[in-house]
Design a protein with these regions (language model features):
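Conserved pre-motif I regulatory segment
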Residues: 1-36
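Conserved helicase ATPase core of P-loop NTP-dependent helicases/translocases
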Residues: 96-102, 265-266, 276-308
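Conserved segment of the helicase C-terminal RecA-like domain
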Residues: 342-371
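Conserved interdomain linker/interface between the two RecA-like ATPase lobes of SF2 helicase motors
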Residues: 178-255
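Conserved Walker A/P-loop ATP-binding site and its immediately adjacent core
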Residues: 46, 63-84
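A short beta-strand element within the Helicase C-terminal
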Residues: 304-307, 313-328, 334, 341, ...
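Post-DEXD/H (motif II) to motif III coupling segment of the RecA-like Helicase ATP-binding lobe
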Residues: 138-198
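Walker A/P-loop
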Residues: 29-50
Length: 474
């Protein structure tokens, strides 16, 4: 039955359409579906199309279907709202500081707000038929459990780039089935993600030795912020950050991931002294100020943003040219979310530069490594599960005696190349002119479908979709 709801959406990329069909088919078999697709490949656009199909089916059959979309940050809620508007899906928002409009069948809610003790009656009264959870790797938290208790048999979809938990306990206690998309490497080969050059400190560096000796962890199992600050927020290490930026990414647009507000401010100050156009953002930055910085960053008026976990999830700026990792982590989720911010392809970006100043790849391998998502989904009850822990850092103490001056400098670890036949840039087959792009923008603003635009330019539909993506019009 549910598989019949899925419709062909010409604005989706081929793999998104395939994923949408698979999601509806999975709902024929079970209630709770988790879907994995890498950062930067369009999960929000995908589930917005799912919602549009459900709503259309309900209208056609005279059934008022209610849908609740859940996210854990206001930036994600606003991004979801923007995508729903593109599909002309009227909706309300349930989040702190937002005026509620509960007459709409579709509601986008903050998990913190909808499960707050003052709103739990509201959550139950919504009487929803479908629940969509963004960044669903968070869904094992107690706040999400309240939704499962309220709606045990409601159809649910959880989307995430990383179905992974620090304790490796899996997700089978809340989800019935995991659907997995193509790998990062396949998306790069097909041109839907950008290739990269990966620079890192060596495995016998003094920084890794110090990181390996940290023995203070937070409740989730990651390094304690205070311990990280003690090890990483030192002038010599910040100098290494600046030097590696100047050597490999100077003048490029990028994001730096830092440990804390204090660490972020220290990095920002030293980069500014070197003449870099840079700002820092964290959770305490006023929302209007944060939006202004992000807009200026997108417009090219700011070159670098240093942030503390603000841009790990949901941030969309395709023309980011480099990512710098200045914060060690034991979380595969953080690692892939952070490097993934730089892998969106654009017409003017041949590849992304990744500056790994903390040796994260020694813990998690390269961004394009094969991941055992099904094993992580099943968790510890699966005896063949390969834990995402590395012996590299455990062996650092054995390598201390090999430390030499200069080992903290970055070297090229991996350089992904893509054959020209596989590149995402359609300019290989069609030379796009400025006036072509202006016409594309006009047709897009008029909400012409890719098939109509393809007829105008006498190009195949897939080439048009790729060009629209390159221009950030889709």
């Amino acid at each position: 039955m549910y598989s019949e709801i899925s419709k062909i959406d010409r604005s989706l990329r081929p793999y998104q359409q395939e994923a949408k069909n698979n999601i509806f088919s999975a709902w024929d078999e079970c209630d709770n579906v988790m879907f994995q697709m890498p950062t930067g490949t369009g999960k929000t656009r995908l589930f917005s199309s799912v919602i549009s199909d459900i709503k259309t089916w309900g209208v056609q059959h005279g059934i008022p279907i209610k849908i609740l979309i859940i996210a854990h940050r206001i930036e994600l809620i606003e991004q979801i709202s923007e995508n729903l508007e593109k599909y002309k899906v009227s909706h309300g928002i349930i989040a702190g500081g937002k005026q509620r409009d509960l007459k709409h069948l579709v509601q986008v809610a903050s998990i913190q707000t909808i499960t707050h003790r003052n709103n739990i009656d509201l959550a139950g009264a919504l009487n929803v038929n479908f629940i969509i959870i963004d960044e669903a790797h968070h869904s094992t938290a107690n706040s999400y459990k309240k939704l499962w208790d309220l709606y045990p048999s409601t159809k649910k979809l959880g989307v995430t780039a990383t179905p992974w938990r620090m304790n490796h306990m899996g997700f089978t206690n809340i989800f019935d089935k995991l659907l997995v998309s193509k790998s990062i490497q396949e998306f790069i080969a097909d041109g839907w993600l950008a290739p990269y050059s990966y620079y890192s400190i060596n495995d016998n560096s003094s920084i890794l030795r110090d990181i390996n000796n940290i023995d203070e962890f937070d409740i989730e199992g990651d390094y304690k912020i205070s311990a990280l600050e003690h090890v990483m927020d030192r002038s010599c290490i910040r100098a290494n950050l600046l030097n590696s930026y100047k050597k490999y990414a100077e003048g490029k647009k990028g994001i730096i991931y830092s440990i804390s507000r204090k660490h972020s401010e220290h990095i920002c100050s030293e980069y500014k002294e070197a003449g870099v156009n840079i700002v820092c953002i964290d959770s305490k930055t006023p929302r209007d100020e944060r939006r202004l910085y992000v807009q200026r960053f997108r417009n090219g008026q700011i070159d670098i943003i240093v942030n503390v976990d603000i841009f790990s999830e949901g941030f969309d700026c395709p023309d980011i040219e480099f990512i710098q990792l200045a914060r060690p982590t034991r979380s595969l989720v953080k690692y892939l979310q952070q490097v993934g911010r730089g892998l969106r392809p654009t017409a003017n970006k041949s590849k992304c530069i990744i500056l790994d100043n903390v040796g994260a790849h020694l813990e998690f391998d390269m961004p394009n490594a094969d991941r055992q998502w099904f094993e992580e989904f099943e968790g510890d009850k699966n005896p063949i599960r390969k834990k995402q822990t590395s012996s590299h850092r455990k062996s650092q103490t054995k390598k201390e005696q090999t430390f030499e001056e200069g080992d903290d400098e970055l070297t090229l670890i991996d350089d992904i190349q893509v054959e020209s036949s596989s590149t995402n840039s359609v300019s290989k087959s069609y030379e796009w002119k400025v006036e072509d792009d202006e016409l594309l923008k006009t047709l897009s603003e008029k909400q012409c479908s890719p098939s109509v635009i393809a007829a105008v330019f006498k190009q195949d539909e897939e080439s048009i979709v790729k060009r629209l993506i390159e221009l950030n019009l889709l």
